[in-house]
């Protein structure tokens, strides 16, 4: 789905794809209603999709999943993100920059008249919006971009540019993310409004992963407003490593941007993430592994211990928090789980 608007897929079973099931790029308003990835056992298939079930890059408007069922994919159920392009040259007047798309062709991400954010590589912090006046293509991955305003002197070569015109609001509800997959549940990095509610997660890896990647995949989208509520998480994380690694995620919900805080005063990458009123059935300890979030809430959840699988996660604390601020963990019920414990890194006790 490329350069499209107002697209609906409804009541579709995807029984085999050699890659992703549904992929969207620079498209607006996409609805997936009762779209299911299903392993075709009659053809002796082992996977429904070789890669992600659903994947959306630099889309905007609303991406909605309603009543979808994801099983048997070779990678994640859903990934929604933008793209960082690296600044490789800046003109003397700072009104022209050269961009390099490290993992993704820059010409497919940026167009004339798009607004952009410059990003500090070392912190992930955004600068003021600017606008692309025109683009000269050097190759599919290299663009020379003329800006309306000079690039602020804070930014230089090896920093990044993110598209500020193309990012999505997201609604995911009444879906099932099943165990018969190799990787994680849903990956969400977008500054739009995100609501995840009334879903069932039985994922092999972490159920929800929120990143922001400036060192490998270069997937952008620092979160500003995310509400995860009234979901059922059931024995997620069975792909975790038993040899000290993190496997497919450190905890039930992992928030792990590339930026690593140096101390308690380091800037934060994500903001306003609320995890509330969920039911969590877990055979292992780690509930949250969170880095660089301001305004994190884990409130009014019910955590119930199961013994369906042996504990294998490398993280042995309930909550691992690094460089976070204004955190509230309260009013939760723990049934058979024992007392929750914490690992705090670069955290002020007042936070």
Predicted regions located by residue number:
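Ser/Thr/Gly-rich low-complexity blocks that favor extended beta-strand/coil architectures
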Residues: 104-141
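Surface beta-strand/loop "capping" patches
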Residues: 86-115
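Small/polar beta-strand repeat architecture
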Residues: 126-170, 174, 178-180, 185-187
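Solenoid scaffold repeats with emphasis on beta-solenoid/beta-helix
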Residues: 2, 6-7, 12, 20, ...
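Short glycine/acidic-rich loop motifs that flank beta-strands on beta-rich extracellular proteins
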Residues: 18-23, 40-52, 74-80, 121, ...
């Amino acid at each position: 789905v490329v350069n499209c608007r107002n697209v609906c897929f409804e009541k579709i079973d995807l029984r085999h794809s050699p890659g992703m099931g549904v992929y969207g790029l620079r498209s607006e308003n996409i609805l997936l209603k009762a779209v299911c990835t299903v392993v075709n056992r009659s053809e002796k298939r082992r996977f429904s999709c070789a890669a992600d079930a659903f994947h959306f890059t630099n889309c905007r408007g609303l991406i909605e999943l309603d009543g979808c069922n994801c099983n048997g994919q070779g990678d994640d159920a859903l990934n929604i993100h933008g793209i960082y392009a690296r600044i490789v040259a800046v003109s003397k007047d700072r009104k022209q920059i050269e961009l390099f798309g490290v993992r993704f062709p820059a010409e497919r991400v940026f167009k004339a008249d798009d607004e952009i954010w410059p990003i500090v590589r070392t912190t992930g912090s955004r600068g003021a919006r600017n606008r692309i006046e025109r683009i000269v293509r050097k190759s599919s991955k290299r663009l020379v971009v003329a800006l309306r305003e000079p690039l602020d002197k804070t930014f230089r070569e090896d920093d990044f540019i993110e598209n500020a015109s193309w990012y999505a609001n997201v609604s995911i509800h009444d879906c099932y993310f099943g165990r018969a997959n190799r990787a994680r549940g849903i990956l969400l990095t977008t500054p739009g409004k995100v609501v995840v509610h009334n879903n069932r997660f039985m994922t092999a890896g972490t159920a929800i992963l929120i990143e922001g990647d400036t060192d490998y995949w270069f997937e952008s989208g620092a979160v500003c407003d995310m509400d995860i509520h009234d979901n059922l998480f059931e024995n997620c994380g069975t792909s975790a490593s038993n040899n000290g690694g993190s496997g497919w995620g450190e905890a039930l919900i992992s928030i792990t941007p590339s930026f690593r805080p140096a101390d308690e005063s380091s800037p934060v990458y994500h903001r306003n993430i609320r995890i509330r009123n969920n039911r969590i059935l877990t055979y292992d300890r780690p509930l949250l592994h969170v880095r660089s979030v301001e305004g994190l809430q884990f409130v009014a959840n019910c955590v119930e211990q199961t013994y369906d699988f042996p504990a294998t996660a490398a993280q042995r604390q309930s909550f691992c928090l690094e460089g976070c601020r204004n955190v509230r963990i309260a009013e939760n019920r723990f049934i058979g789980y024992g007392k929750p414990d914490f690992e705090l890194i670069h955290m002020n006790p007042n936070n």
